[in-house]
């Protein structure tokens, strides 16, 4: 998603600097200035598909799912702030963190919730520096009620961006506003990050989303079928769940491919068809289906 802070904030809200003190001009507290953004309409950048209702729960993600729901039910509590979710690609991190945002908006539509990736944040910051709009950039983010950031590992090695996010993080946390973060590894394994920022990542709740277990793999495949209004034979569900083991996205992709083959070629849904689809979708090794994590 792209989000142009300067364009999306009316000119009347732009914070200007007064070069010299004057008896006729009262200086404003910068932490009060950010409240002027609260009247600006904000697109939360949340994907409406990523809800709690569409999220498949199992033992492998139960802790993260339970905490995510608790944040929405009891936003006044700061026990899990920030919530830091980590895990490999394709295990449902983006879905879960956006579900928190959607749940919060459903409970309080006026809440200023924003989802974005760390890479988008870094790009916006670079643009703000180039255009001499860093104050506007910081004040905008300090006006957010819940900040949801994906892939914070993208901050690695970007010291200036980290320092800016550090100050935004401190302000939001001090104001008891929630921060939801995702990463591909735990804070202890993050390289190229400022120690003071890393320490703040662990202030609240750090929880892992591991590779999906068998129950979750079956549930994901069945939910895709239910959403499509298709009845899938149990032996096909079992075959896919047994052979696509590490990545929820791959399971969803297999379902789409299976339905495309069945529809386009007018073929019945069988294990043989599923085997053929998997052989073209994932790597075959020693007569067993395996695959790597796709980005």
Show which residues each predicted segment covers.
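Intrinsically disordered, low-complexity basic tails and flexible linkers associated
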Residues: 1-114, 119, 178, 184, ...
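Short glycine-rich substrate-engagement loop in P-loop NTPases that contacts/grips substrate
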Residues: 105, 109-146, 159
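Loop/turn-to-beta-strand initiation segments
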Residues: 111-112, 143-146, 175-181, 205
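Short regulatory helix/loop adjacent to the ATP-binding pocket of P-loop NTPases
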Residues: 126-130, 187-203
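Conserved ATPase-coupling elements of RecA-like P-loop NTPase cores
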Residues: 153-166, 190-193
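Conserved AAA+ ATPase "SRH/arginine-finger" region at the nucleotide-binding site
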Residues: 189-191, 204-216
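Short conserved motifs of the RecA-like P-loop NTPase core
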Residues: 231-243
């Amino acid at each position: 998603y792209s989000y142009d802070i300067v364009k999306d904030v009316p000119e009347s809200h732009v914070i200007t600097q007064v070069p010299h003190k004057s008896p006729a001009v009262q200086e404003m507290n910068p932490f009060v200035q950010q409240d002027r953004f609260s009247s600006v309409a904000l697109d939360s950048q949340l994907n409406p598909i990523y809800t709690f209702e569409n999220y498949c729960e199992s033992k492998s993600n139960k802790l993260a799912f339970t905490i995510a729901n608790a944040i929405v039910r009891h936003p006044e509590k700061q026990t899990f702030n920030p919530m830091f979710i980590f895990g490999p690609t394709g295990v449902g991190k983006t879905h879960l963190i956006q579900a928190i945002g959607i749940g919060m908006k459903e409970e309080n539509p006026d809440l200023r919730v924003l989802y974005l990736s760390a890479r988008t944040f870094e790009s916006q910051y670079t643009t703000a520096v180039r255009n001499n709009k860093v104050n506007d950039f910081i004040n905008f983010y300090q006006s957010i009620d819940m900040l949801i950031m994906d892939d914070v590992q993208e901050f690695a090695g970007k010291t200036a961006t980290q320092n800016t996010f550090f100050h935004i993080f401190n302000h939001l946390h001090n104001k008891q506003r929630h921060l939801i973060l995702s990463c591909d590894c735990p804070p202890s394994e993050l390289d190229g990050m400022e120690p003071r920022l890393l320490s703040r990542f662990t202030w609240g709740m750090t929880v892992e989303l591991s590779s999906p277990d068998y129950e979750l793999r079956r549930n994901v495949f069945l939910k895709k079928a239910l959403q499509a209004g298709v009845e899938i034979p149990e032996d096909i569900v079992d075959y896919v769940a047994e052979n696509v083991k590490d990545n929820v996205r791959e399971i969803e992709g297999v379902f789409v491919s299976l339905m495309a083959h069945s529809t386009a070629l007018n073929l019945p849904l069988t294990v043989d068809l599923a085997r053929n689809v998997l052989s073209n979708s994932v790597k075959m090794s020693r007569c067993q289906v395996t695959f790597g994590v796709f980005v």
